[in-house]
Amino acid sequence: MTKKLHIKTWGCQMNEYDSSKMADLLASTHGYQLTTIPEEADLLLLNTCSIREKAQEKVFSLLGQWKLLKEKNPQLIIGVGGCVASQEGEQLRQRAPCVDVIFGPQTLHRLPEMINHVQGTNSPVVDISFPEIEKFDRLPEPRAEGPTAFVSIMEGCNKYCTFCVVPYTRGEEVSRPSDDILFEIAQLAAQGVREVNLLGQNVNAYRGATYDGDICSFAELLRLVAAIDGIDRIRFTTSHPIEFTDDIIDVYRDTPELVSFLHLPVQSGSDRILTMMKRAHTALEYKAIIRKLRQARPDIQISSDFIVGFPGETQQDFEQTMKLVADIHFDTSYSFIYSPRPGTPAADLPDNVSEEEKKQRLHILQQRISQQAMEISRKMVGTVQRVLVEGTSRKNVMELAGRTENNRVVNFEGSPDMIGKFVDVEIVNVYASSLRGILLRTEDQMDLRTHESPQSVIARTRKENEIGVGIYQP
């Protein structure tokens, strides 16, 4: 009888990536098949996030529901991973004894052994250590699920912003070897992936070892990824302003595969608040980065993160944030009311901003950025946009949906054979969360690179010397 696995994922794209790797790993080692129905599962995994307010309460609320399932099925195994698990550790089991496995973001690759331990000894196991980059050596080969894919290139953070738990839950920055990343992306490209999104808590802090013992910078990695046959779009998230060096900006100047869209968190427009957050840059320095980016790529759109109501934030501080929003003309944002995270320095600061004031400031900020996003969308009407077709439209299965470079969903009429390919569409209408397009040309009518598999490249370029040793000759 097939064993079923249910994974509930909260949080960032890194968590989504980790959950997909857990599913692949447990399918290869234990034959688990994914199910969306918790009641069907033999193994329940919760991949948690501790960034937002009341993260712990949310976890224990769901575990209370899963406890009832375990009472009906004592053989059910319950595991909790992610950042809350890393924070809480053994204390998590004290509040929720139904949990059998507790693992951190850096130990998910040990899940098969942990499950075997629980099944063999009927006793719980906790592993929230930070074994550097070991997990990537233990995960199965990547499996494409559509024309886009996420690839983790580094983990952790060394910045220790005063509001953030990431350095404490995911550890300090560790970069994967560049060859491992390129091989994973080449495997995905051979399966039809056209767009890759490089992931990391501070992705532009990437410093990965090369095969010859040198160090590959993030800018160098971007160019190497762009050279992989079949990869026509590159995104990355999340980056930090102090790591956004000029060599990365140069890649925007000469590498068209890198999209004209960047998510670069700033958190506040007030230098005083930025100092209290330990962001290590000023608003002016942030604006200088954007100015240089727009010189290199005039059509680039910028999104960001904002925290409103940080302890001590005055009305003047907030107005400086709003000025930055207007000056940069941000496209979109992830903006939240500040909530203290246990164990962070900011949690000890006196919170003298009223809840009403926080809510009002958040509303003003979000309204302004929504207006700016709509302005940008309306300016796209009448333009021709290259769209990567991801599948059928959510609202009408008879239509297709894809994304523009600046991350907007476009719905249009087309045929199923276009899925996974690029098309050019004219934007004819704008809606709250999507655009309407008319198909102009298909990928076959474009001057794109011809897709060629790694195997065919080797077959075409392999030569042998006089003693029969294979030589690569480009």
From Swiss-Prot:
It catalyses: N(6)-dimethylallyladenosine(37) in tRNA + (sulfur carrier)-SH + AH2 + 2 S-adenosyl-L-methionine = 2-methylsulfanyl-N(6)-dimethylallyladenosine(37) in tRNA + (sulfur carrier)-H + 5'-deoxyadenosine + L-methionine + A + S-adenosyl-L-homocysteine + 2 H(+). HAMAP family: tRNA_metthiotr_MiaB (MF_01864). Residues 3-120 form the MTTase N-terminal domain. Residues 378-441 form the TRAM domain. GO terms for molecular function: 4 iron, 4 sulfur cluster binding; metal ion binding; N6-isopentenyladenosine methylthiotransferase activity. Binds 2 [4Fe-4S] clusters. One cluster is coordinated with 3 cysteines and an exchangeable S-adenosyl-L-methionine. It is found in: Cytoplasm. Keywords: 4Fe-4S, Cytoplasm, Iron, Iron-sulfur, Metal-binding, S-adenosyl-L-methionine, Transferase, tRNA processing. [4Fe-4S] cluster 2 binds at residues 157, 161, 164. Pfam families: Radical_SAM, TRAM, UPF0004. Residues 143-375 form the Radical SAM core domain. Its cofactor is [4Fe-4S] cluster. NCBIfam families: miaB-methiolase (TIGR01574), MiaB/RimO family radical SAM methylthiotransferase (TIGR00089). This is tRNA-2-methylthio-N(6)-dimethylallyladenosine synthase. Transmembrane segments: none annotated. It comes from the Bacteria.
